[in-house]
Each structure stands twice: as C-alpha cells, then as structure tokens.
Regions:
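A donor-sugar binding/catalytic signature common to diverse glycosyltransferases
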Residues: 69-117
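Hydrophobic, well-ordered secondary-structure elements that form the walls
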Residues: 35, 47, 76, 86, ...
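Conserved catalytic-core segment of nucleotide-activated headgroup transferases in glycan assembly
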Residues: 1-61, 71
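Short, conserved active-site loop motifs that form the nucleotide-linked donor/cofactor pocket
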Residues: 45, 64-66, 82, 126
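C-terminal amphipathic helix plus adjacent low-complexity
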Residues: 137-225
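Short loop/helix-cap segments at secondary-structure boundaries that form the rim of catalytic
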Residues: 55-64, 77, 96-97
Length: 225
C-alpha cells in the first residue's frame, strides 16, 4: 500500500538506484546535487531514490523526491505507473527492467555495465549518461526529459518485454528435450571441443611467449652491446 500510494502521487514516477556497488550515499556532493536539482526541475514527477543513509536528509525540502533505504525493485518495475528507471545498468537491474518493459536512463560505472549500457542504447530502450556528466544538472535533466517525453522509448521497451516474456519453450522443456536427444544418440564426438585436449604449454601459449621473450632479449642484447 505504501508504494502504491507513492506511485499515485503524480502522473509520472522515476525510480533511481545505482546498485550495491555504487551506493548513493557515497556519491560526490555534486552528483547528489544534480539528482536533487532534477527533482526540482520536474515538480510534476515523483522521484524515488534508493538512498542508504536516511540521516543525511538527502531529500529535505523537495516534496517530490522520496528516499528509501530499501525498495521492492522488481515489483516497482512491473507496475505500469512507473515511467522511468535510472540505473547503473548492472546485469540484474537491466534484465529486470527489460522484462518489465521500463525505459531507462543508464549511468554505467564499471565492468559489464558499459556493455549493458551499449545494448540499451543500441536497442533504443533508453539513453546513456556518462557518470562524469552527473556533475552537470542540465545533462541529467535532458536525459530524463528525453525518455519521459519521447514515447518511442516506452514503446520499444514494451515490445522487447513482450518478446522476452513469450518464450517458445520453457526451461524444463528444453532440458527434457536435450536429455532425450542425448539418450537417443549418445555422446557426440562432433561436439567434443578440441580445446580441452590441449597441453599445458599449448593452452597458455607458453611456446609463443617464450619465442617473443627470447626475441626481445636478443634485440636488447644487440642494441646494448
């Protein structure tokens, strides 16, 4: 009931979470100010901010900015009243958003998040914001405005979710089919990967490394002497 009431407060709702690695309370002050300024710039939009330190009073004085140490993320994403998800683009959060049909503003920080963000942009499911741009209020606000006001992002997100949720086969059916195939045809040499038969030297390219290392040593010896 609490979250349903929050979603009913205004015509649009934006949920912001940057995962467990990039915690909101550890953000530079400039980044936090950018988020607060964005909420002020969209007074008719409710902003839900996953923020781990309530004693910071990060949302003080901004009625449409609601901070919470915990958010039922998957349930929130699957509610049709949610308009936009601002995320670090981790694999889990991105997958949940894609299955729920929610458009994104992604701020990748590390590792696979950059690749995930590229896929989001490539498929037209949202826009990418470089984390350094969080210092600029106008850049963050423009990204939010682009996704909120351009219905094509929502349309593509819903279409992608429809395809993801309509699986031609369940995991159980695939497993049973593969087991029946294996029982009927037995071990298949054609699928036996040759790589698993490589020797230690071949697998780690020790012979190649040795040749390169010796060549470098030889060249250095000639140059030095």
């Amino acid at each position: 009931q609490k979250w349903s009431g929050i979603l009913d407060l205004r015509p649009k709702t934006v949920y912001m979470s940057f995962g467990t690695f990039a915690r909101a309370h550890m953000m530079p002050a400039e980044y936090k100010n950018t988020i607060r300024n964005a909420a002020r710039a969209f007074p008719d939009v409710t902003f839900i901010w996953k923020y781990e330190k309530p004693e910071h009073n990060a949302s003080q004085g901004i009625p449409n900015l609601i901070e919470s140490t915990w958010v039922p993320q998957n349930d929130l994403l699957r509610d049709s009243r949610l308009s936009l998800f601002v995320t670090h683009c981790g694999q889990g959060s991105t997958t949940e958003a894609n299955y729920a049909g929610v458009p994104l503003v992604v701020v990748p920080v590390i590792f696979d998040q950059v690749r995930n963000a590229f896929q989001v942009k490539k498929n037209g499911l949202g826009v990418i914001l470089n984390k350094a741009e969080l210092e600029k209020s106008h850049a963050f606000e423009n990204a939010i405005r682009e996704v909120l006001h351009n219905p094509e992002y929502k349309q593509r997100a819903v279409a992608a979710a429809a395809m993801l949720n309509e699986k031609p086969f369940t995991a159980r059916e695939i497993f049973v089919h593969n087991m029946e195939f294996l029982a009927k045809h037995g071990p298949l040499r054609q699928l036996d990967h040759y790589g698993r038969k490589l020797t230690f030297i071949q697998y780690y390219l020790i012979d190649v490394i040795a040749v390169v290392a010796l060549s470098i040593i030889l060249v250095l010896s000639i140059v030095i002497y």
